[in-house]
């Protein structure tokens, strides 16, 4: 919902809801970790951790109260990435917490028609989705990650979003060191067929979540049409290519 001037209704709520204090944030983190452990998880990847949240995680690890392993990713080109660049890749002495990656965002989601496509949405002529971060900003953050030896994990869902990220990785990663850097594309849901082999060629990890195939089943065909579905949720093709 939004007002006539396109101000999100949520902005009215955000303006009056107080920010969570340190005690509340710590309690929320403890509950999330405990629930993860209860469900049998031994480790998680937390995609987008601020420097303040990392400090909270460190305090729990220091006290021996981190019940599972946490692979934390810095929240974009912000304070946590700057800290990684200045201090080096981080691993807690206890071995259960590390930060050695940054999470970036290229485009939006498929269901809301925000995933960036090369051609129009099949059910929305004239709309090709959007880049939630400018191409220049994402490329600058990737270049920074390369300089700092930090793994870049970039959200890309549409075929245009994936192509932009693959192009940036190809251009910015040292050719003789690409696979060792273990750069990832998060989700890689809709990929142009000609771009599928590039994951293996560039040593890029396709970090895909099976639940997206089932959650998108009601609308994926309508959004992108039968032809583009050939490059969608392509686990078998990517595995066969060596990705």
Residue ranges and their predicted role:
Residues 66-69, 95-98, 148-149, 180-181, ...:
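Loop/turn elements at helix/coil->beta-strand transitions in domains of secreted/extracellular proteins
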Residues 1, 6-85, 104-161, 174-177, ...:
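Divalent metal-binding segments
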Residues 53-54, 162-170, 197, 216-223:
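Histidine/acidic-residue-rich catalytic or RNA/ligand-binding cores of hydrolases
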Residues 90-98, 172-187, 191, 237-238, ...:
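Structural recognition of alpha->loop->beta junctions
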Residues 96-114, 203-214:
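Non-cysteine beta-strand/loop elements that form the S-adenosyl-L-methionine
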Residues 56-64, 144, 168-175, 195-198, ...:
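Alpha-helical structural signal in soluble globular domains
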Residues 190-243:
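Active-site-adjacent C-terminal substructures of enzyme catalytic domains
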Residues 80-102, 191-205:
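Short amphipathic alpha-helices and their capping/turn segments at secondary-structure boundaries
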